[in-house]
Amino acid sequence: MQRREFLASTSLAGAVAIAGCNSLFETESVRSVPDVVEDRPDAVYFPTHVEGMEMIGMTAAGDYTIGLMYSFPHRFWTVTGTTTEKVSIRDKDDIHLMASVWDDETGTVLPVGSGLSMTVEQDGEVVTEKPPWPMISQNMGFHYGDNFALDGEGTYDVTLDIGSMNVSKPGPFEGRFEESASGTVEFEYSVDERDGLRFETFENQQGERGAVDLMEMEMAPVSVAPEPDAMPGDHLTEATSGDAVFQVTAVRDPSFTDGSGTYLAVSPRTPFNRVPLPMMSLSGTVERGGEPRFDGALSKAVHPDIGYHYGALLDGIESDDAVTITVDTPPQVSRHEGYETAFVEMDPIEFTVS
């Protein structure tokens, strides 16, 4: 898969707390990564552990705001098609760097279609440079991240280069986020400070259906899809495929339709936390009286009222129309533990408009 397409939001506080989970955790004084759960469901499940993280800093870059944070090195899984592959922690890995991007004007988490790269420098010399993976994790949601090897303790500069958004931008975002941008954040790395981050395990819940709560966010938006009754338009259906929850609406708002037709908006999200699922390929059909009214791809899109979603402009939609949404490619986004077995094998969604 390509290391590109979506960024999440995060807190701008110094140390990031996990909300609502303390009673479920046992804090370890010494970090020891547990083995992966053997009998994992093909669904979202409680991971073996969760790790704290700390905000390094933030910077403005063109129309974007970037937040950078770090944690312990993580194991994670990449996805290519319907195949997942575990990425283990290397002995030389020192930290897991994570980047988040959002729009300050609307508080909307933004996809960056042409990718993101990170360059880590010390005293003007490049230590490492690579494009981080687009990821989802239960406590953070969407972010770009990867494990990095540093050159000992000290001061580092992390430069983030952001590409333009190559997704559909109906409404207020039309014409914005067209240019590439860059921002640099200074980072003081200390082993003691890293090792002082929280590291908490699930002793009894690991492997069970459920999810860790998203982090508390103070100064930054949260990458959460809206509740069904908060989505614009007429709600058509809620359905589940591959453990993802799909909310589908028909929107006639001119900011979506340019004044004509009906916009079919499809919002896939994780169960429990409603984290939007990016980097999918969806297509759909609409039939009326057995005759095709639409047959085509749904475009990746972002709008302040829905966030990241998939949509298509129709000439209209009526009661008794038969709608099918097909997942041509599941989310090609890397996953932290607890998400790697879900959202892989995904059946079509079929419903009749009531």
Predicted regions and their residues:
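Hydrophobic alpha-helical segments
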Residues: 1-78, 85-170, 187, 243-248, ...
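Intrinsically disordered, low-complexity boundary segments flanking structured domains
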Residues: 51-57, 173-175, 231-238
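Short beta-strand elements
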Residues: 172-205, 339-354
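Compositionally biased low-complexity segments at domain edges in trafficked proteins
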Residues: 192-226
